[in-house]
Design a protein with these regions (language model features):
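The first (N-terminal) embedded transmembrane alpha-helix
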Residues: 18-30, 51-53
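Residue-level signal for short hydrophobic patches within transmembrane helices
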Residues: 10-21, 46
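Helix-loop-helix junctions within the multi-pass membrane cores of secondary transporters/permeases
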Residues: 3-4, 74-138
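Small-residue-rich segments of transmembrane alpha-helices in multi-pass membrane proteins
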Residues: 23, 52-56, 106-110
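Membrane-interfacial helix-loop connectors
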Residues: 35-37, 42-83, 95
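Transmembrane alpha-helix boundary and packing residues in multipass membrane permease domains
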Residues: 31-32, 61, 89
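Short, Lys/Arg-rich, polar N-terminal cytosolic tail immediately upstream
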Residues: 1-11
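Selected transmembrane alpha-helices and immediately adjacent juxtamembrane segments
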Residues: 17, 32, 36, 135-138
Length: 138
C-alpha cells in the first residue's frame, strides 16, 4: 500500500466493478469453450464454482478437448493455480482479515482481485477492492 490520501470508497468500487465486469465476460467464453470441449452443463458449472482461476479452467478444458489424459489435464490446471497461493501470502498480510473469514476469501485470490487490491492506498480501500472484485467475478 502506498502512503497518501485515502481513495474514496466509490472510486474503489468503480474500479473493482470495471475489472470484474470486463474479466467476467471471459466466463461466457469459458462456457462456450467448455461446451465445445464436450463437458456438460453441470460439469461446466461445477468447474466454475470450484476452480475459480480462469487460466486453470481453460487449460483443463483445452487439454480434455484435445483428447488429453484427464489426470494430466487436472495436474496442469492445478499447477497453473498454484501461483495464487503466492498472491495469498501477500494479500493475507495486506487485508488482515479475521481468521474465520480467510478460508472463504482464499477462493477469491486470483490475478484480478490481487491487482485491484494492491492498487489501493489504504487497508480499507484494499478490502473494498478485493471484496467487490471477488463478488463481481464469482
Amino acid at each position: 500500500m502506498a502512503d497518501g490520501a485515502a481513495k474514496p470508497d466509490a472510486a474503489v468500487v468503480r474500479d473493482a466493478l470495471g475489472v470484474g465486469v470486463a474479466v467476467g465476460l471471459s466466463g461466457f467464453a469459458f462456457g462456450v469453450t467448455s461446451a465445445g470441449g464436450g463437458l456438460g452443463l453441470l460439469q461446466t458449472c461445477a468447474l466454475s464454482l470450484l476452480v475459480f482461476t480462469g487460466a486453470s479452467q481453460f487449460a483443463l478444458v483445452g487439454a480434455l478437448a484435445a483428447g488429453g489424459n484427464p489426470y494430466t489435464a487436472a495436474a496442469g490446471a492445478f499447477f497453473l493455480g498454484v501461483r495464487n497461493a503466492f498472491y495469498g501470502l501477500r494479500l493475507s498480510q495486506l487485508l488482515a482479515l479475521p481468521r474465520a473469514v480467510r478460508p472463504f476469501a482464499a477462493q477469491w485470490v486470483i490475478d484480478e482481485t490481487t491487482a485491484v487490491t494492491l492498487a489501493q492506498p489504504t487497508r480499507r480501500a484494499a478490502r473494498i477492492g478485493f471484496t467487490v472484485t471477488g463478488v463481481t467475478l464469482y
